[in-house]
Amino acid sequence: MNLDFSDDQKLLQEEAKKFLTKEDALKINRAVMDSDKTYDQDLWNKIVELGWTGIRIPEEYQGLGLSHLELCVIAEELGRQLAPVPFSSSVYLFTETLIEFGSEEQK
């Protein structure tokens, strides 16, 4: 049984790692901790532009239509870098709930 990531998943992981390292997510996290902000809006905007928030949204709704495994790949890199962004609440909780229980209009 192969429990390794696929080549595409490894590429996604590497690209996420490069992006977050380039953005210096750890430094941004320190700045957020020293402020009254709960997350970094600039980093979050860049993540949204990359399409990461649409990982689990089906392509028919302009998402990426990827699986939970790709979602975990991104989440792992965000956690590794301690990226101060609302990824969990936005993508795990809200998006998954909307996909599962939302009306067509909401989707």
Which residues does each predicted region cover?
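Intrinsic disorder at enzyme termini
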Residues: M1-D8
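A non-catalytic, amphipathic alpha-helix used as a structural packing/dimerization or gating element
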Residues: D8-K18
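Glycine-rich flavin
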Residues: T21-K107
